[in-house]
């Protein structure tokens, strides 16, 4: 039986989320699928050989410094407070610049199962050049045992990159994601929903980055240590 309103699940997964697909697995060119001058956002997609689901890239401007944007994305334990559909987000362990994060996604809709996954996130920031970013890949073997009532996400890889604009007063944000939500969601539903979900990711970032705790570099969210 197909799950109802599958785009709600995809939208939730696209919010995480943040490593690029290996070069050998990429297609040649990105194709622009959405552009909004008012939002200063453009969304691209490209095929990934061997996968029915396309890789996505969102590029947009944020009216906040790169470090503030990075602070938001690195607030892993706080995702449930500002990321839609996130029921639980828990740091499992930290080794230097690498963080293991377990997440539970619940669209709270009939006939749609709760999803979960563990990802390995690497901090790839270059503070000296005011460039910040993360890359992640699926790491379910490092997380909790799968519960029968949940659908385990087997592929979730992506990245965030924040580079300075206007002498560091603003940010050019680049978000890349390739994920398969699993279950019985058809590939056409994933493709349809993904293009509509990326703008929501940027809206969440823009809304949250205005909070004082993310803009003040002397105070950082609990749960991580900036490099």
Please provide the spans of the model-predicted regions:
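A general boundary/transition motif marking the beginning of the first structured unit of a protein
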Residues: 1-2, 193
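Bacterial N-terminal signal peptides that target proteins for export
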Residues: 2-13
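Bacterial N-terminal signal peptides
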Residues: 11-21
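Eukaryotic helix-grip
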Residues: 26-227
């Amino acid at each position: 039986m197909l799950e109802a309103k599958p785009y709600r699940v995809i939208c939730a997964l696209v919010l995480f989320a943040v490593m690029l697909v290996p070069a050998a697995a990429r297609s040649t060119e990105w194709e622009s699928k959405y552009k909004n001058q008012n939002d200063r956002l453009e969304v691209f997609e490209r095929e990934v050989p061997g996968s029915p689901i396309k890789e996505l890239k969102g590029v947009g401007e944020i009216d906040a410094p790169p470090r503030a944007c990075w602070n938001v994305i690195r607030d892993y334990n706080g995702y449930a407070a500002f990321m839609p559909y996130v029921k639980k987000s828990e740091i499992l362990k930290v080794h230097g610049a690498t963080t293991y994060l377990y997440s539970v996604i619940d669209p709270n809709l009939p006939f749609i199962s709760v999803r979960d996954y563990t990802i390995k996130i690497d901090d790839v920031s270059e503070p000296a050049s005011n460039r910040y970013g993360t890359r992640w890949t699926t790491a379910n073997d490092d997380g909790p045992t799968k519960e029968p009532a949940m659908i385990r996400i087997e592929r979730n890889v992506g990245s965030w990159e924040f580079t300075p604009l206007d002498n560091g007063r603003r940010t050019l944000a680049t978000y890349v994601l390739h994920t398969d939500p699993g279950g019985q969601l058809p590939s056409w539903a994933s493709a349809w929903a993904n293009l509509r979900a990326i703008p929501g990711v940027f809206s969440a970032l823009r809304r949250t980055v205005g909070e004082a705790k993310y803009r003040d570099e002397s105070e950082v969210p609990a749960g991580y240590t900036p490099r």
